[in-house]
Structures are given as structure tokens and as C-alpha cells.
């Protein structure tokens, strides 16, 4: 039996930082995607709100015109 056989396990330490770095990059990319999607949703919401307000104003003018 070899005395050093089970005493120490070799760990793949050089790969660990690369895997951690890759995971951090993926997390960062995911956060950027979420941030971009959120900004797009807010922009779309603003446009839709403005359009809704324009249509409501048009409707109110139409109702005032027919009421007189």
C-alpha cells in the first residue's frame, strides 16, 4: 500500500477560478438583459399611456361636440 495514495486529493484549482469567472459573466449578462427589458417595458408603457390619453381627449371632444 502506498502511504501517500489517499492522504491528499488533488483538486482542479486552476479550473475553479475560470468556472467562477464564467458564472459571474453569465450572471452579469442576465442582469443586463433584465435591465434592458425593464427599460423597454417602461418605454412601451409610457408610449401606451400617452396614446390612451390622446384617445381619451379625442373622445371627450367628440362627446362635447355632440352634446351641444
Curated annotation (Swiss-Prot):
Keywords: Coiled coil, Cytoplasm, Cytoskeleton, Secreted
Region (Disordered): 1-34
Origin superkingdom: Eukaryota
Biased composition (Basic and acidic residues): 7-25
Subcellular location: Cytoplasm; Secreted; Cytoplasm, Cytoskeleton
GO CC annotation, single: extracellular region
Disulfide bonds: none
Pfam families tied to this protein: CCDC23
Residues forming coiled coils: 34-54
An individual GO BP term: proteolysis
Main location group: cytoplasm
Function: Enhances the tyrosine carboxypeptidase activity of vash1 and vash2, thereby promoting the removal of the C-terminal tyrosine residue of alpha-tubulin. Also required to enhance the solubility and secretion of vash1 and vash2. May play a role in axon and excitatory synapse formation.
Family stated for the protein in its record: Belongs to the SVBP family.
Alphabetical list of PANTHER family matching this protein: SMALL VASOHIBIN-BINDING PROTEIN (PTHR34762:SF1)
Protein name from the UniProt record: Small vasohibin-binding protein
Organism phylogeny: Eukaryota, Metazoa, Chordata, Craniata, Vertebrata
Amino acid at each position: 500500500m502506498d502511504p501517500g495514495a489517499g492522504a491528499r486529493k488533488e483538486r482542479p484549482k486552476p479550473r475553479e477560478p475560470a468556472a467562477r469567472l464564467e458564472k459571474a459573466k453569465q450572471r452579469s449578462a442576465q442582469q443586463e438583459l433584465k435591465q434592458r427589458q425593464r427599460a423597454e417595458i417602461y418605454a412601451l408603457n409610457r408610449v401606451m399611456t400617452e396614446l390612451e390619453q390622446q384617445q381619451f381627449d379625442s373622445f371627450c371632444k367628440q362627446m362635447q361636440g355632440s352634446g351641444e
